[in-house]
């Protein structure tokens, strides 16, 4: 059975991710304590199910410490993947303000507040407390930073992860994820490697290229004509290729390589696509452009 466990910070999009799994045919359960997952997997396997999605988070606080042991137990008989969703504190505060919902830990840090009344100070304390409690889980999971991500973009990312795992379900290879981003929107917190390409010639200053992206032919032609761009792309490729065996030896499932320019529209997109095209010949590769709307 293939099992995807979704955990992470409250308000980061776990419900969206679980809904994508459900739409993809997974048997999904929300807020299930970790100690019950093996029995559920066994029961569903006996019933003929082959895919299970489970969300577990701070609401099942007492059982979260058992999750690493549960994952090891499940991995003995099943294909298991853990997704950890997170977001910046500012993004989470804004989301809670918009929905008027209370954080699961709010009662512990703001017992005097009226029910249903957001309090930025206590909310920030609750978010940081949750981040601290969940930090051990983030270290061993595939992290997804949703800070500047629209809901439809997150759905597309989860679909890509599912598709990648389906295509490589019998493979133990590490998956390389190349992600472009704009520094003005913040560095992705799920990055394993961060490369800054802001020193490269910028197509933004060409009015004909400004509305385009690094996936469009005119921008590609412009950047490919710049020796500095090609040299930096080659240096990044060489670095990743040299150290990739070390990351594989560390038993990682994913390595997230992020490339940032100023706005995340041109240079970083071009470099990410170029690297992805090269490394596809070496194994499992995904490419993601945080600041661009998903295709289609």
Curated annotation (Swiss-Prot):
GO MF assignments: ATP binding; GTP binding
InterPro entries xref list: P-loop_NTPase, RapZ-like, RapZ-like_N, RapZ_C
TM regions (residue ranges): none
Residues where GTP binds: 57-60
Residues that coordinate or bind ATP: 8-15
Stored Pfam families: PapZ_C (PF22740), RapZ-like_N (PF03668)
UniProt KW RNA-binding keyword: no
Domain of life: Bacteria
Keywords (A to Z) from UniProt: ATP-binding, GTP-binding, Nucleotide-binding
Family: Belongs to the RapZ-like family.
Main function: Displays ATPase and GTPase activities.
Protein name (database record): Nucleotide-binding protein Rmet_0297
Source species taxonomy: Bacteria, Pseudomonadati, Pseudomonadota, Betaproteobacteria, Burkholderiales
